[in-house]
Amino acid sequence: GVLIDDDVIDFCNKECHNVVLSLDGRKEVHDRFRKDYAGHGSYDAIVPKFQEFVKKRGDKNYYMRGTYTHYNTDFTNDIFHMADLGFTELSMEPVVSKPTDPSALTAEDLPILKEQYEILAKEMIKRDREGRGFTFYHYMIDLTGGPCIYKRISGCGSGTEYMAVTPWGDLYPCHQFVGDPKYLM
């Protein structure tokens, strides 16, 4: 996100069917892991760029995707923060890490996480009734034609429909492979 400029926006809007932007939610949550090249949190630099990107994108697909960890098991607050910033296509997924990583989710986190999904559903209904609705990717359930039916048939799309771009420009078939040299494209 820190490298987004008008050229990147124009290219993505012309060439990319769907774009995924990484924002973990609230400033303190995002800045914990999302640093710039100098080691500073990137929230203040990227949020205005993402807002401009989405504004120029019009009705083309995008998702604002965050990651929740042991440090933000109250992740609905991060989703609501993103919605309050004006983003309407949202996704929030659990961290993928070694169990020994301090950010790893634990068995003790599960009751809190389950409760968060209930809170999310209720708030989505409330906001929709108020005319402030948003989409949460993982609640898009359509058993005959939802977004996951195609993934069940053809796989997740890693490296064909989806690629991860690191801040330094390296390409990987999936964000889960970033840093593993055998998957560097």
Q: What are the residue ranges of the model-derived segments?
A:
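Conserved SAM/AdoMet-binding glycine-rich loop
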Residues: 1-27
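Radical SAM enzyme [4Fe-4S]-AdoMet core and its adjacent flexible, acidic
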Residues: 28-47, 51, 55-168, 178-184
